Amino acid sequence: MSLMIDVESLKVGATTLIHALQLEAHRGVVHTLMGASGSGKSSLLAAVCGTLAPALEFNGRVALDGELLDHLPTERRRIGILFQDDLLFAHMTVRENLLFAVPPGPRAQREALVQQALHDLELPGFGKQDPATLSGGQRSRVALMRALLAQPKALLLDEPFSRMDAGLRSRMRDFVFATVRSRDIPVLLVTHDEEDIADRAHLTRLPAPV
């Protein structure tokens, strides 16, 4: 399985953010996308998952495992996304946040998946807690696991470590990369930080907009 992105152009008004770009994120690989602010990195992720703002125009193709996604609604693309802000639901417990993402099925099975997720997060016993009581690193880990519990076929990471201090950033980077690789899905990471690059053999740098 791979995520293929072929961009003819990505524009906002008369400004071309991205032109003639092709990249492929392979299964089990974290492909890193870098570029200056305003180069279209986050907008490209929005185009991939189907949430591009009306002010932007995307011309190109997005395919996952050979299936074109361009005309599918966001919910049918099966692509997860993790932002720099964890965006946990404040009115839900940690357990409820995780359960929200689990696909429909027998309740006992869904609950078992949540308990296993809490174990994998090294947060057993945290299920009943309010997300506001968690540390920044714990919240980020819960947000990642929530994205993965939805069983995405690919995952987009939009500056997920940018608000963390150096020590936490390093630990979270290792945790995220190990976790997504174990799921064997293609991953596209947007970052400004050279230290976030997962593998320089899978790196795309965007030029400045024209």
Where are these regions (language model features)?
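ABC ATPase NBD coupling module
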Residues: 67-84, 104
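A short, proline-enriched helix->beta-strand linker immediately N-terminal to the Walker B motif
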Residues: 149-153
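Conserved ABC ATPase "signature" region
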Residues: 109-126, 177-178
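ABC-type ATPase nucleotide-binding domains, specifically the catalytic core motifs of the NBD
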Residues: 53, 73, 92-111, 120
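Catalytic Walker B motif of ABC-type/P-loop ATPase nucleotide-binding domains
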Residues: 155-159
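Hydrophobic anchor residue at the start of the ABC signature
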Residues: 144
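Conserved ABC ATPase signature
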Residues: 130-134, 138
